[in-house]
Amino acid sequence: MALHATYLGANGWLLEFGELRVLVDPWLTGPLEFPPGAWFFRGELPQERPAPLPVDLLVLTQGLPDHCHPASLALLPPTTPVVGSPAAVARARALGFSELTALAHGARHCHEQLQLTASAGAPVPQLENGYLFDHPEGRIYLEPHGFLDPTLPEQPLDAVITPVVDLGLPVVGAFVKGQQVLPQLVQRFKPLAVLVSTTGGEVRFEGALNRLLWLKGSLEAAAAVLPEGCRLIDSRAGERYLLKQHQPSTAGASAGGAKAGTAAG
């Protein structure tokens, strides 16, 4: 068995903990718009994608449309279990999903062998969620805006999914703090891999708001922060990354030979 992560562009991920498939914040089809309309902010995908079915669990960090995208969520069966922030769960309920769990900060939810812990995330403006995924196949921390809950204890993780640059607006300041948070994430979790999120996928943006955005940081600056032994993965939309693989036991390898090795992959 193994731990895999497939980047879907923007904030979207498919996390595979062995055979358990967890979809996070998918934007797969159609445009992305923020009120009051396209003139203010509009995003278009370079390539639309089908829903990566089957999905065992849908996890939503925020209720905003770039995390809780109506047209993309409509591609999923309404019986798909949903875990999310209170704002995200309210959106999912309005879209017809029926098996819903809203997690407050610090609350936990178990789905099969996966334990999901909600952490305080980005204030947009209500405080949304980050998540700690804990499964026998691996452990991941994910927060899409570069915010780290100070109450999360130090613990070794297999991977951290985070932006690595800051994005902001004049007067408002940074609302994505990837560059600022990366050293804290590395110190807190000592991850074996950091997967770049949020700002990837070659999405095309336009509108009045987009023209005001500023960016600070780079992949090169992020790589310089990471300690030896920690991989920086410049995530590409559609790519599936192997983060951890359990080796078969000596007894199993000798009994099963090549077959056991194939099953592990």
Where are these regions (language model features)?
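Pre-active-site segment of Zn-dependent metallo-hydrolases
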Residues: 20-59, 70-72, 147-153
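Metal-dependent catalytic neighborhoods of phosphoester/phosphodiester hydrolases
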Residues: 70-77, 205-211
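Active-site-proximal loop/helix segments of hydrolase catalytic cores
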Residues: 122-188
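Active-site environment of divalent metal-dependent phosphoester hydrolases
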Residues: 31, 63-68, 89-91, 107-110, ...
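Metallo-beta-lactamase
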Residues: 84-137, 233-251
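Binuclear metal-ion centers of metallo-dependent hydrolases, dominated by the metallo-beta-lactamase
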Residues: 96-106, 153-156, 170-171, 179-265
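Active-site neighborhood of phospho(di)ester-bond hydrolases with catalytic His/Asp-centered motifs
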Residues: 24-25, 55-68, 83-85, 141-146, ...
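Zn-dependent metallo-beta-lactamase
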Residues: 1-44, 191, 209-210, 217, ...
